[in-house]
UniProtKB/Swiss-Prot annotation:
PANTHER family: TRANSCRIPTIONAL REGULATOR, MARR (PTHR42756), TRANSCRIPTIONAL REPRESSOR OF EMRAB OPERON (PTHR42756:SF1). It comes from Staphylococcus aureus (strain MRSA252). This is HTH-type transcriptional regulator SarZ. The lineage of its organism: Bacteria, Bacillati, Bacillota, Bacilli, Bacillales. Its main location: cytoplasm. Belongs to the SarZ family. One of its GO terms (cellular component) is cytoplasm. The keyword Cytoplasm applies. GO terms for molecular function: DNA binding; DNA-binding transcription factor activity. Gene3D superfamilies: Winged helix-like DNA-binding domain superfamily/Winged helix DNA-binding domain. Residues 9-139 form the HTH marR-type domain. Activates transcription of virulence factors alpha- and beta hemolysin genes (hla and hlb). Also, activates RNAIII expression, a central regulator transcribed from the agr locus.
Amino acid sequence: MYVENSYLSKQLCFLFYVSSKEIIKKYTNYLKDYDLTYTGYIVLMAIENDEKLNIKKLGERVFLDSGTLTPLLKKLEKKDYVVRTREEKDERNLQISLTEQGKAIKSPLAEISVKVFNEFNISEREASDIVNNLRNFVSKNFDNSDKK
């Protein structure tokens, strides 16, 4: 139970933690139908349909390192959602792209956000404000590239 005047209720990190955990739990209920984790979902949604993306760039988009991405991409490849190919010029450069099945699944996956939103007691305006504030917070405070 949430206690509004507790010490934790005033802590930004705790409120982010609870929100993230509970939102991901709601997504997970829908993602079971596709045999996907939330992390697999965000990786698929981060790849544009006709895009070839190297693992470093993909990691920057989703704030994951290659040690986390590599096993996840192998699982997504086994499910025929992505294909991993090496560049002829530089075999160290691993390119990720969506398969036809990966492209086909993106539309129903995008609808999950709407379903999750509809489970919350929040207006579209409030949701938009939260998204804009969080986007601003992330862009001002977290650098996910190697340009540090």
